[in-house]
């Protein structure tokens, strides 16, 4: 089994690269999906979030947009949330990996904060997806409906491409066409398959 961390700034194209790798046979596990799972109603994570952030509970459930807004500009609150969620996400990722029976599996863990959390060191290969800031802002305003100011604030809140690249084994630039990106992903996939084959 080969453990691959996939990261990149918001709007860089992580999800697109993950989908391309999945289409080629990778087992893709998304940290955001696991984060939603570990604070789903009835989980210990949900109870901890409700206790720490009672102001984001609506009708007994966590209002995820309100939670995101609550922690975005408050570093202390964000650290508290990460202390609840990140250990549970790591635990669930471990369970997913343990359940895989194929020794030649390429497991890609997609995590926007892989570098910021120090988790990159736990992966045999780290892939960083980059794109020019103007490209990312365009994607965020068009596809996600953010204002330019919101997009810039989200980008500024994350590690820089240079910080991510310092932890990377592979840097995929995603400023061109889908065809160009697909060709780059194909080369990376071929390399990953060679690594897992031994």
Tell me what each language-model feature is:
Residues 1-62, 190-198:
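Glycine-rich phosphate-binding loop of ATP-dependent small-molecule kinases
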Residues 13, 32, 81, 108, ...:
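Residue-level signal for inorganic ion chemistry
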Residues 28, 124-128, 171-172:
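Short, well-ordered beta-strand core segments
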Residues 33-36, 57, 132-134, 153-156, ...:
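Short, acidic/turn-prone active-site loops that include or flank metal/cofactor-
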Residues 33-106:
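ATP-dependent small-molecule kinase phosphotransfer cores
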Residues 92-94, 121-122, 142, 146-193, ...:
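Small-molecule kinase domains that catalyze NTP-dependent phosphoryl transfer to phosphate-bearing small molecules
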Residues 93-102, 106-142:
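ATP-dependent NMP and nucleoside kinases share a basic, alpha-helical "lid"
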């Amino acid at each position: 089994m080969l453990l691959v961390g996939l990261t990149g700034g918001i709007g860089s194209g992580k999800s697109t690269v993950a989908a391309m790798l999945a289409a080629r046979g990778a087992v893709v596990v998304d940290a955001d999906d696991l984060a939603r799972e570990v604070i789903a109603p009835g989980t210990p994570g949900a109870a901890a979030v409700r206790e720490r952030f009672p102001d984001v509970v609506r009708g007994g459930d966590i209002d995820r947009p309100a939670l995101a807004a609550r922690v975005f500009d408050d570093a202390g609150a964000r650290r508290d949330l990460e202390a609840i969620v990140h250990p549970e996400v790591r635990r669930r990722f471990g369970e997913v990996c343990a359940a895989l029976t194929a020794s030649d599996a390429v497991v890609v863990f997609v995590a926007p904060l892989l570098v910021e959390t120090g988790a990159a060191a736990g992966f045999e290969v780290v892939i960083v997806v980059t794109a020019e800031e103007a490209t990312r802002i365009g994607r965020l305003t068009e596809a996600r409906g953010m204002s330019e100011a919101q997009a810039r604030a989200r980008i500024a809140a994350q590690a820089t491409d240079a910080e991510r690249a310092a932890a990377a084994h592979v840097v995929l630039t995603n400023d061109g066409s889908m065809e160009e990106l697909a060709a780059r992903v194909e080369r990376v996939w071929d390399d990953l398959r060679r690594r897992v084959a031994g």
